[in-house]
Amino acid sequence: MTAATRQEVLCLYRSIFRLARKWQAASGQMEDTIEEKQYILKEARTLFQKNKNLTDPELIKQCIVECTARIEIGLHYQIPYPRPIHLPPMGLTARRGRGLQTQEKLRKLSKPVYLKSHDEVS
């Protein structure tokens, strides 16, 4: 990891913690605010710990883009949770033979940038 990339990652990490400190739930209730703040901090710690050993500059850049997108989406919609994608598991047209592999490939390609670190299939 280059010094500039390290600086950018640390800046994002600090900005997430500042965001969590100032976060207000859209409902305005204190319980929701506390729960959402805890979620933001837990999610940030988990994902940064998961990706701390990455060495490929391209993967690091993708994680930075994902982090930035999640921050922007969270601020815009006032929801700290990732927005779901609405593609049913077998929602694409079925084909014979390699059709299932094609569906899996299309499903991976259709996954938004802000959900790349989540492993579950929506």
UniProtKB/Swiss-Prot annotation:
Superkingdom of origin organism: Eukaryota
Coiled coil, from the record: none
UniProt-listed InterPro entries: Complex1_LYR_dom, Complex1_LYR_LYRM1, LYRM1
A single cellular component GO annotation: nucleoplasm
Name of one Pfam family that matches: Complex1_LYR
Function: May promote cell proliferation and inhibition of apoptosis of preadipocytes.
Family: Belongs to the complex I LYR family.
Name listed for the protein in its UniProt record: LYR motif-containing protein 1
Organism expressing this protein natively: Mus musculus (Mouse)
